[in-house]
Amino acid sequence: MKSWQKVIVGGASLTLASTLLVGCGSASKDKMDSASSSDSKTIKLWVPTGAKKSYADIVAKFEKDSGYTVKVVESEDPKAQEKIKKDASTAADVFSLPHDQLGQLVESGTIQEVPEEYTKEIAATATDQAIVGAQYKGKTYSFPFGIESQVLFYNKSKLAAEDVASYDTITTKATFGGTFKQANAYATGPLFMSVGNTLFGENGEDVKGTNWGNEKGVAVLKWIADQASNKGFVNLDANNVISKFGDGSVASFESGPWDYEAAQKAIGKENLGIAAYPKVTIGGETVQQKAFLGVKLYAVNQAPAKGDTKRIAASYKLASYLTNAESQENQFKTRNIVPANKEVQSSEAVQSNELAKTVITMGSSSEYTVVMPKLSQMGTFWTESAAILSDTFNGKTKEGDYLAKLQQFDKDIAATK
């Protein structure tokens, strides 16, 4: 690995004059000075698709304060890891990404720990769940700027606010729509954490820490199987959720902010209710149903700077600007990104927005959400858990085989490289 890929910034000010280089080998000071002086004062920034215009003011402010020029490029967040790891030296200095990619980027040495100045800043301003999303193995590697969680959408002409606090009440008085026949593990998998089981351990970072193969896990599968005969449950597929909500076939369903406008259009603004997830009774115990929490991040890639400590420090400064309170307020206003900043979350503008307020309720406590693990083994999780969930609902897997299936699942996940 080249020396500039192992730069660790010891400070964050733009006047940073030195840095610790790990594994430099025979690289000389003259070579480093030459590289530093020849680099342009341009920082490449990758922002989410459709977000370039919304960052114009904060980027202009940074350019004025720092003396650096920022080249802003829109890039698809889900492909951030793939693009960065392909050639880090030609990628962006600062880039946006979903938090579940963080672990692999850290393990590959692509990104380094955030300087202490910013770590303290993040700890003081971000919610606890957002901080967890920005960390890996207890260290902070990125800057959180938004949170995302599913919520419950319901038809207020069919269900009252007090009704939707309980899944049993929802399905007794009206109907709930879910995709169980072709299970979506993103939506249904967290039921196992709702009963106290773990996915990759308590912090989501232990490959051998999944423990679904127990009595509680079996109870979850029994509950899923029971929904096939629950008159208040309507099985849906990914393509008909909104249409079934619109024609009255289902009175409620769980989804994310991405379905808000469609849900509103389907039944009318005056009829659309939004609530946190309900409580659900599984194995005779009433528990709070949980969802996965996603955290939107900005991270710094030191490779393009090739050891230029001032440019690296400026990149961290830019990431701080992009995720400060002012920027998060603007992202909420222009793009409906629910902020990770505690102060912005409590603002009148955010609290008066029913959807944002509900996402914050879901995303501000481990009672309602589990921060999605950041391990590469999640690829195996999505495939295998979806198969188990679908086979259970469809009756392909019999009750007597539930425990063995889950125990094998735990082993398969632990053995994945």
Regions found by a protein language model. Give the residues of each.
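Alpha-to-beta junction loops
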Residues: D87-L97, A174-F176, D247-S255, E270
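Short helix-initiation/N-cap motifs at beta->coil->alpha
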Residues: E74-K83, D100, V234-D247, W258
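Hinge/lid segment of periplasmic solute-binding proteins
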Residues: H99-V151, E162, I274-A275
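Extracytoplasmic/periplasmic substrate-recognition and gating elements
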Residues: G138, A266-T334
